[in-house]
Amino acid sequence: MAESILDRTINRFWYKLGDDCLSESQFDLMIRLMEESLDGDQIIDLTSLPSDNLQVEQVMTTTEDSISEEESEFLLAIGETSEEESDSGEEPEFEQVRMDRTGGTEIPKEEDGGEPSRYNERKRKTTEDRYFPTQPKTIPGQKQTTMGMLNIDCQANRRTLIDDWAAEIGLIVKTNREDYLDPETILLLMEHKTSGIAKELIRNTRWNRTTGDIIEQVIDAMYTMFLGLNYSDNKVAEKIEEQEKAKIRMTKLQLCDICYLEEFTCDYEKNMYKTELADFPGYINQYLSKIPIIGEKALTRFRHEANGTSIYSLGFAAKIVKEELSKICDLTKKQKKLKKFNKKCCSIGEASVEYGCKKTSKKKYHKRYKKKYKAYKPYKKKKKFRSGKYFKPKEKKGSKQKYCPKGKKDCRCWICNIEGHYANECPNRQSSEKAHILQQAEKLGLQPIEEPYEGVQEVFILEYKEEEEETSTEEDDGSSTSEDSDSESD
């Protein structure tokens, strides 16, 4: 109980003061002040502490009014135990309590198997315990090899790795000639400076140790086995073939956008140095002619300014190109500034020489700017799924009965002139042609007879005897006249 009350009071004190804001000197001063406050009834003014972040609102006093009931009971219990120990003649054993900056006391560790103390649960985190993210020194997944070791397993830039490794091996051998006089020691060095398939090649190959340089033999074998270049048998032919490929690539290279000047120059320079040094001036002129906009001006400057060794320098030509490019950039900046220049200020320098001349005015077109916001905001409503909207069953269309205007079937059929049905339901209806004829007859005021005839031509036959006689006599006369004409012709 004594330890819990003491821990509580000290932790409350450190929490109010703010232990993170104290320096080492302030921390030592605080410990000394607390030790003095425990001795007697001393009044301590904590506002004298040299700290801007430390704010003390009260003056601490160790009077009886500031002691709580639990603390007073604790002090009485300590007094009783001290009196009993003094009566018994034994000296009391005081437990040393050390204060730290973490805001609590250092409690002795419990024995194994004991329950965890509450102190560890209430322990405040210090600056050392906090997590500060730091950038890793190496990129995760990137294989880091030691300096001078050659490992070309599944590597894309094998030629660069082999050239760097060969240069380092040659430097070691030439600077330590006394140690590497024997080819066996050189092979041993090369074997220990390689790993993977390169090491297996050096170990399993029978090298000619009597004639030739052993380093050149190993490098030529690596070029043949790992790069596919036949350097061991015909090195001259391989170099000539590389030069031809470089020349073809330089002629095919094109620069369409001036912003890619650095990449174009790098590729052209890498291929140019594979050719002979005497051919450099011609390739430099070709390089300048491929550059758009400023290539012609840069070429004329290169021919006038280049002299001596600068004729073979592609870097000198690239420098001239960059200077011309910067001039054009400055000119464009000036043109942008001239657009904002006020023409009314031109009369300050010199008087105008134009009198009565009409100024050509150009029509101004107002530029339409696109609105940044919509004139209306569409209201989006969540649509519910309705099965009847898309899957509505088809209606069964049946034969609907037509009614007369009065609501009864008392109309008269105009084909048979009988009430009770329509003309389309008439049993005497035979064809649409007959119905058309009946319509025409009805317009003329004619009515159908009770007993209809079968034929179409026999429906409206008019029987007049006088007309028949006249027609018959006319026919007879016509026949006689025709006979007379025939006889006369004979």
Curated annotation (Swiss-Prot):
Q: Name one Pfam family in it.
A: Caulimovir_coat_dom
Of the GO CC terms on this record, one is: T=7 icosahedral viral capsid
Which ranges belong to the motif Nuclear localization signal?
122-125
Annotated zinc fingers (CCHC-type), start-end: 411-428
Where composition is biased (Basic and acidic residues), the residues are: 95-111
Q: List this protein's GO terms for biological process.
A: symbiont entry into host cell; viral penetration into host nucleus
Give GO terms: molecular function aspect only. nucleic acid binding; structural molecule activity; zinc ion binding
List compositional bias (Acidic residues) regions by residue number.
Answer: 81-94, 465-490
Location within or outside the cell: Virion; Host nucleus
Which SUPFAM superfamilies does the annotation name? Retrovirus zinc finger-like domains
Start and end residues of each stretch annotated as Disordered: 79-143, 464-490
Sorted alphabetically, which InterPro entries does this protein's record hold?
Caulimo_coat, Znf_CCHC, Znf_CCHC_sf
Keywords assigned by UniProt, alphabetized: Capsid protein, Host nucleus, Metal-binding, T=7 icosahedral capsid protein, Viral penetration into host nucleus, Virion, Virus entry into host cell, Zinc, Zinc-finger
Q: What does this protein do?
A: Self assembles to form an icosahedral capsid, about 50 nm in diameter, nm, composed of 420 subunits of the viral capsid protein. The capsid encapsulates the genomic dsDNA. Following virus entry into host cell, provides nuclear import of the viral genome. Virus particles do not enter the nucleus, but dock at the nuclear membrane through the interaction with host importins.
User: Could you give the subunit structure recorded for this chain?
Assistant: Interacts (via nuclear localization signal) with host importin alpha.
Q: Which family does it belong to?
A: Belongs to the caulimoviridae capsid protein family.
User: What name goes with this protein?
Assistant: Capsid protein
Organism, as annotated = Cauliflower mosaic virus (strain D/H) (CaMV)
